């Protein structure tokens, strides 16, 4: 499988490392508007046996984003700001037919993406939203005590 990571900021660093170290991906691509920043970010990551590919992308260039997504098996959206980028990325994932994991914490973008549910289901696309720190991990902290009862 091949994974696409959109964005190269602070939240992308552990995601890139995890994807590279899991062993289930034969390739990871980091796509960003800032390829030089991506190179600098990747240079700081320890313990990588190989390097991810880097591509320049503007997530608002729908045709280019869909084409890039189609070359991968899953997309992880870490390209902020969420209020501006989450919805176009979700629409592109549906058009590409590629599953999407998104860390968006923006409630308005979340509502817009949830409104795409039927379209995503019809396209056979799974979209996982709010998988950042908060919401995301904090939901697990809330639910964990209840799961133990």
Regions found by a protein language model. Give the residues of each.
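N-terminal Rossmann-fold NAD(P) dinucleotide-binding loop
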Residues: 12-13
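Conserved Rossmann-fold cofactor-binding substructure of NAD(P)-dependent oxidoreductases
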Residues: 55-74, 78-84
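Rossmann-fold NAD(P)-binding glycine/threonine-rich loop
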Residues: 103-127
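ADP-ribose/adenylate-binding Rossmann-like module
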Residues: 81, 92-110
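Rossmann-like NAD(P)H-binding beta-loop-alpha module
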Residues: 123, 128-149
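Conserved N-terminal Rossmann-fold NAD(P)-binding element of oxidoreductases
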Residues: 3-9
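Short beta-strand element of Class I
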Residues: 27-29
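Helix N-cap at the beta1-alpha1 junction of Rossmann-like dinucleotide-binding domains, i.e.
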Residues: 34-37
């Amino acid at each position: 499988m091949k994974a696409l990571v959109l964005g190269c900021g602070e939240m992308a660093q552990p995601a890139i490392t995890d994807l590279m170290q899991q062993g289930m991906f034969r390739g990871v691509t980091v796509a960003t508007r800032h390829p030089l920043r991506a190179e600098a970010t990747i240079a700081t990551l320890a313990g990588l046996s190989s390097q991810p590919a880097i591509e320049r992308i503007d997530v608002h260039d729908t045709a280019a984003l869909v084409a890039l997504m189609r070359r991968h098996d899953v997309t992880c959206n870490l390209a902020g700001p969420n209020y501006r980028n989450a919805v176009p990325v979700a629409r592109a994932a549906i058009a590409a037919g590629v599953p999407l994991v998104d860390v968006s914490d923006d409630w308005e973008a979340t509502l817009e993406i949830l409104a795409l549910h039927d379209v995503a289901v019809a396209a056979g696309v799974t979209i996982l939203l709010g998988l950042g720190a908060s919401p995301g991990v904090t939901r697990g902290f809330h639910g964990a005590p209840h799961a133990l009862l």
